[in-house]
C-alpha cells in the first residue's frame, strides 16, 4: 500500500459527525431504524442491515462523543427532576445542531478575520464561549486582534453554539 498524498486536508468535528450519522442511517444503525427493524422482525420480515458490530459500536460511540456539549455543567440538585427538552438541548453540542448551510455561513464569517487554518478548525470544533477560551485557541490573540474584534468573533461564534 502506498500513501499518495499525506495529510491532504483536515476534517472538522462537524464533517466527521455528519459522515458518521449518514453512515448510521445508510446501514440502519440509528435508533429509529433499529426500532423499526425490531418491529418488522416481530412481524416475520427479515431485513438484514450491514452487519459489522465493531464498526457499528465505534460509530455509535464517536457520534455520542461528538454530540455531547463539553462545556455543559450540570448544576442541578440530585433530587430535582430536570426538564427533558431544555436540559437535553443544553447537553447537545453546537455542531450537532448545525446544518450544512449554517456551517458554511460560520466558516464564511470566520474567513473575514485573519486567522490561521488550524485556528479556524479549533474554533469550529470547540465553539468557544468566552474570551479565555478564545485566547487559548488563537495564537498571540491580544497582539493580533483588538478587544472589539475579539468580542465580534465571540458574538458570531455564540450564534452557532
Curated annotation (Swiss-Prot):
PANTHER family: CALCITONIN GENE-RELATED PEPTIDE-RECEPTOR COMPONENT PROTEIN (PTHR15561), DNA-DIRECTED RNA POLYMERASE III SUBUNIT RPC9 (PTHR15561:SF0). One of its GO terms (molecular function) is nucleotide binding. This is DNA-directed RNA polymerase III subunit RPC9. It holds the Pfam family RNA_pol_Rpb4. DNA-dependent RNA polymerase catalyzes the transcription of DNA into RNA using the four ribonucleoside triphosphates as substrates. Specific peripheric component of RNA polymerase III which synthesizes small RNAs, such as 5S rRNA and tRNAs. The RPC25/RPC8-RPC17/RPC9 subcomplex may bind Pol III transcripts emerging from the adjacent exit pore during elongation. Present with 2930 molecules/cell in log phase SD medium. GO terms for biological process: termination of RNA polymerase III transcription; transcription by RNA polymerase III; transcription initiation at RNA polymerase III promoter; tRNA transcription by RNA polymerase III. The keyword Transcription applies. Belongs to the eukaryotic RPC9 RNA polymerase subunit family. GO terms for cellular component: cytosol; nucleoplasm; nucleus; RNA polymerase III complex. Component of the RNA polymerase III (Pol III) complex consisting of 17 subunits. Forms a Pol III subcomplex with RPC25/RPC8. Interacts with BURF1/TDS4. Keywords: DNA-directed RNA polymerase, Nucleus, Phosphoprotein, Transcription. It is found in: Nucleus. It comes from the Eukaryota. It comes from Saccharomyces cerevisiae (strain ATCC 204508 / S288c) (Baker's yeast). Residues 75-96 are annotated as: Disordered. Residues 82-96 have a biased composition (Basic and acidic residues).
